A protein has these predicted regions:
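Short, glycine/acidic-enriched loop or turn micro-motifs at the edges of active sites
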Residues: 22, 54-55
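Long, charge-rich alpha-helical interaction segments
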Residues: 85-96
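Short beta-strand scaffold segments in enzyme catalytic cores
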Residues: 57-61
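Nucleotide/phosphate-binding catalytic cleft detector across ATP-hydrolyzing
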Residues: 1-47, 66-80, 101-156, 163-190
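Gly/Ser/Thr-rich beta-alpha loop segments that engage phosphate groups in nucleotides
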Residues: 55-56, 162-163
């Protein structure tokens, strides 16, 4: 690669992998680039990383020495934006509305479990919780086809914006899983 006559970089190898790997790297470093408190542990044991994004869920299994197990890593076309669509449809039917609620109202329902209809608060927590469970099950079914049961993994990390929205539902699937701080920025930081 050159800029004019000056070489900028000599690319020796290029590897394409899932965003989940970048999220793993994020867990290895502090904000200043120094090794995190978890660095030694995470680099010496098998770790699963599940990045629940808007449209896709990426997963990666990293083996000791930070080697990616490509047979257990990949991407699935199921993401947290499906929750907005599902809740919107359920609320429209449940509330007998002619048109769908605005996206902002659906997002509020996901956060608070309630919507305002004709100026009055209505609880929709049961519908939201049912749809969260359904989507988390769908996501985890897809993840298990790659990652497996997770019994052989020392850690499982849930990252991405979906890890915030579906935190409680996702953590039920792997007893040793955790959601790191600010999981929505994990792959960008990594």
């Amino acid at each position: 690669v050159k800029c004019g006559d000056l070489p900028l970089a000599k690319i020796i190898e290029n590897t394409v992998t899932t965003e989940a790997v970048a999220s793993f790297v994020d867990q290895l470093m502090d904000i200043d680039g120094s090794p995190s408190d978890d660095y030694e542990e995470l680099t010496q044991v098998p770790v699963g990383v599940i990045d629940v994004g808007g449209k896709t869920t990426d997963c990666a299994v990293l083996l000791p020495g930070m080697m990616v197990d490509s047979s257990r890593s990949g991407s699935n076309d199921v993401g947290v934006l499906m929750l907005v669509e599902a809740v919107s449809a359920k609320l429209r039917a449940h509330l007998d509305l002619d048109t769908a609620l605005p996206t902002s109202a659906i997002e509020r329902a996901l956060r608070t479990g309630s919507v305002k209809i004709y100026g009055k608060e209505q609880s929709v927590k049961e519908i939201v919780d049912e749809e969260k469970e359904r989507l988390a099950d769908q996501i985890m079914s897809a993840v298990r086809t790659k990652v497996g049961s997770g019994v052989d993994l020392d850690h499982v990390l849930f990252v991405g914006g979906g890890a915030i929205v579906l935190r409680d539902q996702l953590l039920k699937h792997y007893p040793h899983a955790r959601v790191p701080d600010q999981p929505e920025f994990a792959n960008a930081r990594g």
